[in-house]
């Protein structure tokens, strides 16, 4: 027979603990038994409601109970979930496999996880605040609550036109199904919408970075409603421009000038690097494309014999490297590098920097998405100079980008 809940004894215990300077809340708090009784009564009530006359006629009956420990704001309690013969009882007050019931605690756990805290650090926080340490599995199950949100976010429809888009990948180590640490690339597509707001259009995990996978990324954007991209800013990955223009043939592609400079200087002797960079600056900082091409000829005359591969790389990629000269200084500053998406990556790395190897692709995706979710809270205002940027774009691209 179930022992009746003795409210008087709980009250007396609470008074004694107050006199002794002990807490009412937490693992050994006086209020936990009261909450435990209420929760168990609620579960019993749910089972009574479940076992309707129709259920009973079908032979369904109570079939014992299953105990589990549940963390609450008042401390840890033991709940006894009733079971039925047909295993059709699905409690809602305390759901199956739910082990944390404290109001706001699940959100707090997800918030701590989003800041890069490990499950051990979160467990320590719970011990300090709830009075009981929790293992990694329940914490991981709490953070899994964000997975349906990620799925919905990744399949959401997008705007039809984005004036500027940056595409770049960030790399992490992940444990694969064999238990080996492997490299994973997260492909990020960061755009500016018509109103000048930043928007992460999508993130995609793959085994490595390549033009073929970028093609699938671009196809996904198209399937989600993106009909046109005016300017795409990318690094120098081979085949990338062709992948873009196979899906968006009218898109202007700007190769990252900074990437090109970094790649160039690696093949210039250390004693000549300072002078070479000074001459190269005259090319990419020229006032217009015509002047830049004259400076590129001078660069070839001076350094072409000594560093032919470097000069040839600039010449072969010139059309995509010099796209930015067609635009105003404000637009040039935005598009001649992939600094915008790299800046986003730096913010992500602040959260992930202490993670050596992620246990799975899912764990990686959860943390990066939650970090992004915090970052996007700051993307409430359009770019400061959007008015001076959008109007020249509207004039240049005409029907493709109407402001009014």
State where each predicted segment sits.
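Short, conserved DNA-binding cores of transcription-related domains
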Residues: 1-99
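Basic, short loop/linker segments at the boundary and entry of helix-turn-helix/winged-helix-like folds
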Residues: 61-115, 131-144, 160, 211
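RNase H-like nuclease fold core
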Residues: 82-85, 93-97, 129-133, 145-234, ...
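Metal-dependent DNA phosphodiester-chemistry modules and their immediately adjacent helices/loops
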Residues: 90, 264-294, 298
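DNA-recognition alpha helix
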Residues: 120-131
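Conserved beta-strand -> loop -> alpha-helix junction used to position metal-binding or nucleic-acid-contacting
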Residues: 231-238, 243-279
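Acidic/histidine-rich catalytic cores and adjacent linkers
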Residues: 249, 282-404
């Amino acid at each position: 027979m179930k022992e009746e809940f003795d409210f008087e004894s709980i009250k007396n215990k609470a008074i004694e603990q107050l006199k002794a300077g002990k807490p009412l809340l937490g693992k050994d708090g006086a209020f936990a038994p009261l909450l435990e009784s209420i929760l168990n009564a609620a579960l019993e009530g749910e089972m009574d409601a479940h076992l309707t006359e129709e259920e009973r006629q079908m032979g369904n009956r109570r079939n014992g109970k299953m105990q589990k420990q549940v963390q609450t704001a008042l401390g840890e309690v033991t709940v006894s979930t009733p079971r039925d013969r047909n295993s059709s009882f699905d409690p809602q007050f305390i759901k199956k496999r739910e082990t944390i019931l404290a109001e706001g605690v699940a959100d707090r756990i997800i918030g701590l996880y989003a800041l890069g805290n490990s499950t051990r650090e979160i467990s320590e926080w719970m011990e300090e605040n709830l009075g009981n340490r929790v293992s990694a599995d329940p914490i991981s199950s709490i953070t899994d609550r964000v997975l349906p949100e990620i799925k919905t976010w990744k399949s959401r429809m997008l705007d039809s036109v984005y004036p500027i888009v940056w595409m770049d990948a960030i790399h992490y180590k992940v444990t694969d199904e064999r238990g080996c640490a492997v490299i994973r690339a997260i492909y990020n597509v960061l755009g500016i919408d018509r109103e000048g707001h930043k928007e992460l259009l999508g993130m995609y995990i793959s085994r490595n970075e390549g033009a073929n996978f970028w093609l699938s990324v671009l196809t996904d954007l198209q399937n989600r409603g993106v009909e046109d991209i005016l300017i795409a800013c990318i690094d120098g990955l081979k085949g990338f421009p062709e992948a873009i223009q196979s899906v968006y043939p009218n898109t202007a592609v700007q190769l990252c000038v900074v990437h090109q400079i970094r790649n160039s200087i690696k093949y210039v002797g250390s004693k000549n690097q300072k002078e070479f960079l000074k001459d190269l600056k005259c090319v990419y900082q020229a006032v217009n494309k015509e002047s830049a091409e004259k400076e590129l000829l001078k660069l070839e005359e001076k350094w072409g014999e000594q560093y032919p591969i470097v000069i040839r790389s600039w010449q072969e990629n010139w059309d995509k490297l010099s796209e930015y000269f067609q635009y105003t200084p404000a637009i040039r500053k935005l598009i001649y590098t992939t600094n915008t998406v790299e800046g986003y990556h730096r913010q992500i790395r602040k959260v992930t920097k202490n993670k050596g190897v992620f246990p799975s692709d899912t764990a990686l995706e959860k943390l990066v998405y939650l970090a992004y979710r915090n970052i996007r809270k700051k993307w409430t205002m359009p770019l400061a100079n959007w008015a001076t940027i959008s109007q020249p774009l509207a004039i240049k691209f005409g029907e493709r980008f109407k402001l009014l």
